[in-house]
Amino acid sequence: DLHSFPTRRSSDLPTGCRRSDIVHNAYGYGLFTGGLGMHYGVERLGATILPVSGGGTRRQVMLMNDFGSTVLCSTPSYALFLSESIREAGLDIADLKLHTGIFGAEPWSENMRAEIESKLQIKALDIYGLSEIMGPGVGIECSDAQDGLHVWEDHFLVEIIDPETGEPLPPGEPGELVVTTLAKEAQPLVRYRTRDMTRINEIPCKCGRTHRRIERIRGRSDDMLIIRGVNVFPQQIEAILLETQGITPHYQLILSREGSLDILEVKVEVDEKLFSTVGRSEERRVGKECRS
C-alpha cells in the first residue's frame, strides 16, 4: 500500500492515511490528473473516497462535516480558502475529524504549511506528481519527518541535472529533476526533463524508509526570475509575504524594465487585519512624532 505510516498529533488523533480513513478529494476530476489519480490511489489503499472535485466551497464544507472526513486532498491554496469558509459557516475546526492533509499541484512554502496546519489543525503533507509520468504519487512526504518527498524508486529513477547544460549533478546539488519510468507499459519515458527545481537527499530518513528523497519543489526552471543578476523564485517572495499579518498567499509578480534595470512589482491580496495593523503602527509613529 502506498501510504504514510501513522503518527500522533497533539490531540491524539492519528496522522497519515489508512483503510479506516474517509478521504475528501477536492482535486479536479476533469482532464487534470490529480482528481482521478488520487481517487484510484485511495481506492487501492482501501479507504473511503469522497469524489467532491473542485469548486462549490460551501458544499464542500457541508460534506466534510456531514461525512466526517478525516483526510483532505487539495491544492494548498484551496486548503487555506476552505479553512476560512469553515469559519464563515459557523463551524469550529476542532469539531471536524480532519487529521491529515495531502497537498500538491502547486509549489508551496514551509510558511504556508505552518499556516495550513495552524488553521486546519492537521498535519500537512506534500505530494508530487506530473501528468506526463503518472499524476500524483511519484513522491510523497512521510508523516514522521515531513522532510523531503520519498520517491517510489521501484517505479521511477530520478536524477538532477544542470538546467542550462543538461549535465548530471551529484546528490545534494540543486538543479532540474529528470525522471525515467521503470514500470510504465504505456508511454514509458526515459530521462524526462520535468523543469521542476529540487535536489536529492540521500541522508536516511528517521521514518526508516530507504527510498531516496527529493526536497520540496523550489519552483520551475522557467519560473526562475533573474533580477539584477540575482536568481529569485516566487516561493521566496511568498515566504516573506506570509510572515506579514493580513496578507493572503494570493499574489502577482510583475517584472518590467526601466532602462537597464529590472523592476519587480509585487501585487498582493490583503484583508482588514493588514489595515488595522498598519493603522495602529502609524498611529503610534505619529503620536511619538507629535510628542517629540
Q: Which ranges hold each PLM region?
A:
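Active-site glycine/GP-rich loop and adjacent strand/helix microenvironment
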Residues: 45-292
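Short, small-residue-biased leader/transition segments that mark boundaries at the very start
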Residues: 3-10, 287-290
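Conserved ATP-dependent adenylate/AMP-binding module captured primarily in the ANL superfamily
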Residues: 9-22, 57-69
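Conserved AMP-binding loop of ANL adenylate-forming enzymes
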Residues: 13-49
